[in-house]
Amino acid sequence: MTFKQIAIDGPAGAGKSTVAKKLAALLGYTYVDSGAMYRALTYWALKNDINIHNVEAIVNLCTSIHITFINQDIAVNNQIVNTEIRSPEVNNNVSHIAKIPEVRKHLVSLQKCIALSQNVIMDGRDIGTHVLPDADIKVFLTASTQERAQRRYIELVEKGIQTSLMEVEQGIIQRDQMDSKRQYAPLTQADDAVVIDSTGKSIDAIVEEVLRIFNGKERG
C-alpha cells in the first residue's frame, strides 16, 4: 500500500506547525513535527547538563534516548515535553544541535520510517528537499521576520514563558542564518514546492489554500 505524504517547509515562526496540525485533523493524516524532534534532543541535553557544543556527547545522547509522538504530543523516554521544548533556552541552542550531520541522519531515518507506514503531514526545514523528496505535495511557507517574531512571542506568552519580543526576533534572525548556512541539509525551498507567503493571512486561509492544492492534485 502506498501512503500519501505532504511536506511543509519554511523558516521559524512561519506557521508550519499550526497549519500542519489543522490539515492533519481535516484529512485524518498523522502529523509529524520534525523540528520538535531536534528541540526534544536539545532540551534533553540541556536538562542533563550536556555541553551543546560537544558533538560526540550529543550524538551519543541522540542514539540512546527514545523520541516519539504520542497522540500528537512529543515525548522523550515516554515523558511529554511539549512546553519544555519551546523555551527561549531551547530556541537559542537547537540550531547548534540540528547542524550536526550524525544527528540529522539519525532523526531523518526515524522520520522516513514514520512516513512509510501511514499518511503523513510533516513539517520542518528540509522535508521536501531531503526527508521526503518524493512527497505528493510540497509547500514552502514563509512570512516576514516581524510577523514570525510576533507569532512566536504570543505563543510563548500564552504558555507562560517569560521573554521579550526583541529577544524572540533576534533569536529568529539568528536561527534563519544558521539554518540557511549549515553544511548538511540547509533550509532550502524545493524546486517543485508551492510558495505561500503567510504574512497578514489567517491560519484558516492558509489551510484552505493548501487544501485547494491537495484537492487539485487528487483530481489529477
From Swiss-Prot:
Residues noted as binding ATP in the record, renumbered to the chain: 10-18
EC number: 2.7.4.25
Pfam families xrefs: Cytidylate_kin
Enzyme class, first EC level, given as a word: transferase
GO terms assigned for molecular function: ATP binding; CMP kinase activity; dCMP kinase activity
GO cellular component terms given for this protein: cytosol
Catalytic activity: CMP + ATP = CDP + ADP; dCMP + ATP = dCDP + ADP
InterPro entries, sorted: Cytidylate_kin, Cytidylate_kinase_dom, P-loop_NTPase
Residues annotated as signal peptide: none
Gene3D superfamilies: P-loop containing nucleotide triphosphate hydrolases
Sorted UniProt keywords: ATP-binding, Cytoplasm, Kinase, Nucleotide-binding, Transferase
Localisation: Cytoplasm
GO BP annotations, alphabetical order: nucleobase-containing small molecule interconversion; pyrimidine nucleotide metabolic process
Family as reported in the entry's similarity comment: Belongs to the cytidylate kinase family. Type 1 subfamily.
Name of protein: Cytidylate kinase
Organism: Alkaliphilus metalliredigens (strain QYMF)
GN (gene name): cmk
